[in-house]
Amino acid sequence: MSTHALQNFELHVLVAMLRERGETYSVPLVLELEKRIGRPVSQAAVFIALKRLEQKGLVTSRLDEPASGRVRRYFKVTKQGLAAVEAQRVEHVRLWRGLERVLRVHKA
């Protein structure tokens, strides 16, 4: 697997996409991200992250032209995207391992 450096927000978008299970577009991702990270998220920021992820080969997209209404671009996580999320998860687990005691001491 080619390793691509993921920006923090790109990782958030990939994780939100995995929670949506399958293809999704930017609006549900905005709602999921706002719910999970507890702050406002712009649709433009999500779309920019999606385009970057697509350029890295971590997501694919397709246009859906409905009989009526707006055209939507649907995105889907690729196998490489799934591998990138798993690699980031493993890295974060290693990074945080052993800090529970330190954080409890500072919390007390």
Language-model segment annotations:
Residues 54-71, 76:
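Beta-hairpin "wing" of winged helix-turn-helix
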Residues 2-3, 50, 106-108:
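Short, contiguous hydrophobic alpha-helices characteristic of membrane insertion segments
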Residues 2-45:
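N-terminal helix-turn-helix DNA-binding core of bacterial DNA-binding proteins
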Residues 83-108:
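Amphipathic alpha-helical dimerization/coiled-coil segments
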Residues 1-4, 62-64:
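Short beta-strand/turn micro-motifs at beta-sheet edges
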Residues 46-53:
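Basic amphipathic alpha-helical segments that dock to polyanions
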Residues 77-81:
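Accessory beta->alpha helical hairpin/"wing" motif in late/C-terminal subdomains of nucleic-acid enzymes
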